[in-house]
Structure formats: C-alpha cells, structure tokens
Amino acid sequence: MKKEDVVAGMLAYIAHLREVGRYSTAKSYLDALRSFKCFCGMEEIPYAYIDKERLLLYQAWLSKRGCMRNTVSTYMRRIRHIYNLAVEAGEVSYIPNLFKGVFTGVESKRKKALPLDSLRSLMGTPRVEPEMRRTQLCFCLMFSFSGMAFVDFAHLRKENVKDGVLSYHRQKSGSFIRVEIPVSYTHLRA
C-alpha cells in the first residue's frame, strides 16, 4: 500500500509502533503529526509540500507558540524520519539537505536543583499532618533511590528488593536499574 502523503505515512508508522508496544514513541509521533497538520491547515499533506522553506516556517511557528527547542527538534526529527521512510519506499524523491538549517539536535537542560535547606525541610520535618506524612516518606524514598521517577516508584513490588539492592525496569525506557539501598532503609525488606 502506498502512503503518498505525510499523514498516511505517519499514521501507518504510529500503528506499527503501537503493535510493537512502543506507546510513548507512538504518542510522540502523533503529537508531531497533530502539530504539523495544524501548521499546514490541511488533513492530507503531500510529501511534495515539504520543502526547506516550509520546514523553517514550521520551526518558527513552533517557537512562536512557546515550544521549547527540544520539542521543536523532536517534531522535526519525527517528520524527517517519516520522510526518510518514504524515500526508502520510493514514494518520494530524495532532496539533499532538506533538513539543513532546521534544529534537530538536543539542547541539554539546566538542572533545577532544590536548595539544600529546602531539601532538609522536606525530608526532615516530622511535623507534617498525618495525611501528608506518607507523601513525605515516598518523596524521601524516591530521592534516596537515585531520584527515582514517581511512575517507577508506583510500580515497585516487594520482589524488587533483594539482598539490599533494589532492581526494576524503568517504565519510560524499559532499561534495567539496580540501586543499592542505603543502610538507613534496610528495614524495608519484606
């Protein structure tokens, strides 16, 4: 089946991603598609419609709408990937340097660290209301477990703790993580 336009090509790829269980990546492609359709003002976008000038206009449009550079880059890389798939399938002719000048890099984020006094206050204040105490304890554990994401914390089971080591798979990436449990938390073993 030929997918002569960007929308059809991206929807087919999104369906493939969902079939193989890559739901977060599929959502990223869907977000990029919705944004590009909004910019173009069309439901069907032929590959011929994509040119360097239009990509630069789209980049500027995203920036004006308040998108961060990494979001702009992600959307552009999604479009570039679908375009490259179409080139490989012979649906569109290759245009050299089509994405040259378009930001597709990754900008490192400035870490927003909590001041030490605030961290001590959050972790050491036992004077919180009883209904907030559990939240405070969860925060302390997540911080102590190398800044564990809440979604990973929520999926933990007793089986994840063995011999003073917490082992789990990240929900976001599926990567395997092993964290040595600080001595002060060894009473958590089941």
Question: Residue spans of the language-model regions?
Answer:
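N-terminal helical hairpins
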Residues: 1-4, 19
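Glycine- and acidic
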Residues: 65-67, 136, 167-171
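Basic, Lys/Arg- and aromatic-enriched nucleic-acid-binding interface segment
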Residues: 98-150, 154
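N-terminal core-binding DNA-recognition domain of tyrosine recombinases/integrases
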Residues: 11-24, 33-110, 125
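Basic, Lys/Arg-rich DNA-contacting stretches centered on the C-terminal catalytic core
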Residues: 104, 163-185
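Short, charged phosphate-coordinating catalytic segments
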Residues: 84-92, 142-163
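Conserved small/polar residues in nucleotide/adenosyl-binding loops
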Residues: 186-190
